[in-house]
């Protein structure tokens, strides 16, 4: 449910050429079926001319309600179409959870 909301909002606001939303909650100390830890890979030319912090702020603004109420952790990987073409291995893997709850 949360994953679908993330996908819909990012598609609507950024019109990405590529979008992947990955629920990484299983990598953390949370109950099975949780939707609390996500990784997003967004490729959109709307990021052109923006620094990394500006891109992340834009994603945070789009997902503000979800971040306030549902999402505990969000790994964000943003690219323009040109940057994505140069990216040989795609976005980096997320690290495994080091413990702690939530």
Swiss-Prot record:
**Keyword Hydrolase set for record:** no
Q: Which SUPFAM superfamilies match?
A: BolA-like
Disordered as annotated region, ranges: 83-102
Keywords, A to Z, come to: DNA-binding, Stress response, Transcription, Transcription regulation
The lineage's top-level taxon is Bacteria
Q: Which InterPro entries match?
A: BolA (IPR002634), BolA-like_sf (IPR036065), BolA/IbaG_stress_morph_reg (IPR050961)
What is the protein's name according to its record?
A: DNA-binding transcriptional regulator BolA
Organism for this UniProt entry: Vibrio alginolyticus
Gene this chain is encoded by: bolA
């Amino acid at each position: 449910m949360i994953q679908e909301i993330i996908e819909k909002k990012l598609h609507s606001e950024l019109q990405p050429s590529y979008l992947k939303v990955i629920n990484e909650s299983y990598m953390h100390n949370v109950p099975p079926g949780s939707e609390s830890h996500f990784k997003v890979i967004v490729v959109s030319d709307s990021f052109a001319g923006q620094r990394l912090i500006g891109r992340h702020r834009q994603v945070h603004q789009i997902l503000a309600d979800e971040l306030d109420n549902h999402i505990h952790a969000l790994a964000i990987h943003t690219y323009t179409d040109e940057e994505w073409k140069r990216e040989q291995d795609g976005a980096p893997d997320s690290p495994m959870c080091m413990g702690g709850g939530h």
